[in-house]
Amino acid sequence: MKKLGLIILVLGSVLLIQANSSKYTEDSKLSETLFSLGFTKPNHFINYSTEQVEQGKELVYEGRTIGPDGKQSRFISKYYNCLSCHNTVKEDPNPAVSDPEARLDYAIQNDIPFLQATTFRGIVSRESFYNGDYEKKYGDLVEPARNNLREAIQLCAVQCAQGRKLESWELEAILAYFWTIDYTLAELNLSDDELFQLNYASERGRERQAIDLLRTKYLKASPATFVSAPQNLKKGYEAKGSSSRGKEIFERSCLHCHEPDGVSSASFHTDFSFDFLERTFYKNKSISFYSLIRNGTYAMPGHRPYMPNYSKERLSDKQVEDLRAYIELKAQS
C-alpha cells in the first residue's frame, strides 16, 4: 500500500509539473501559438509598436487619431466608424460555427450588440474576407479584398463607411490593433484534454497534429449568403416570431444605429416609431421592411450613408419574424 501511495504521489507530482510548465495555456493567443508550431505567417503579419496599437484602437473606435506628425488625423468617414457595424469581442459561443440563434443568445448573455458585420476578434487568423455573396453588392471590388486583409480594410473604409482611403500608417496601425485582439485558446473552447493534447503533440515533434487540432476550432472565413424578402409580405417567412427575442434584436441591432444621436438620420426610439415600422412590412416589395433588411440600401448622390444588409448568417428568417412580432406588439399596444 505504501508503494502504491508513493507511485500515485509521484505521478501526481509529474502531472502537476507538466500542467505548470505547459507551453500553451488558456491565455495563449491563437496566432502566436500557430506560428510557434511552424504555421506560415499571413501577408498581413506585422511587427508592431505599442504606439501603433493605441493609434489603431483610436482609429477603430473614434475614426481618427494623432498621426506621426503629432497632429489630429482626418476622420476616415464622416458617417460611420468601425464599431457602427463590427464588434471587437468574441460574439459566437463556438467560433467554429456561424449560427445567428446561438449568437443572439450569446449577445444577450454578454450584453453586446448584434450586428450585420463579423467581429474583429480573431480577424487576423481568418484567411478570406468579403466572402460568399458580397460580390453581388460590391462587384469586382471584392476580388482584391478576398485574400488580402489590407485590401479588405480599405474596401470597408471607402465603400462600406463611404469614407476615404486609409494612409499607409493608418492601415498598419489598425493591423497592429487587430493583432492584439486575436482569439485566446480559452475563447476557442479547448477542453482540458485538448489543451493537454496540444502541448503533448508540440513537445514530441508533432506540430502538424497540433496545428490541425487548433484549426478545427475557428472559422477561417465568415460565410455570407444573401436571401430574398418573402414572396408574400403579409404572410412573411414561414417561421413564427417571438416578440421577446424580437425586442432583443431591436435593441441590440436596430437601435445600435437608429437611436437618438445615432449614426442614422432615422431614429426609432419612440412608441410612434413602431406604427411607422409596422406599416413598412406591407409596402411595395422593393421598399418593404423585409427588403431593407435583406437588401440594405445603397449610397446615392446627396445621401451617401447607407444601411448594410443582413445575410442569413447574421440574421435568420426566424429572427426577422421575431423582430416583426415585437414591432407589431408595440404598434398595437
Give the ranges of each region predicted by the language model.
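The canonical Cys-X-X-Cys-His
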Residues: G56, Y79-K90, I174, F178, ...
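Ser/Thr/Pro-rich, low-complexity mucin-like regions
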Residues: E167-N189
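Electrostatic cytochrome c docking/interface patches
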Residues: E32-F75, N199-E251, S265
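Axial heme c-ligation environment in periplasmic c-type cytochrome domains
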Residues: G38-N43, P68-I76, F120-I174, H269-D275, ...
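Secretory-pathway/luminal and periplasmic proteins that interact with or process carbohydrate-rich
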Residues: I66-P68, V89-A96, I181-L188, S333
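Bacterial Sec-dependent signal peptides at the C-terminal "C-region" and cleavage site
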Residues: S13-Y24
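Sec-dependent N-terminal signal peptides
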Residues: L4-G12
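Gly/Gly-Pro-rich "capping" loops immediately C-terminal to redox-active cysteine motifs
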Residues: Q72-A145, E259-L292, N309
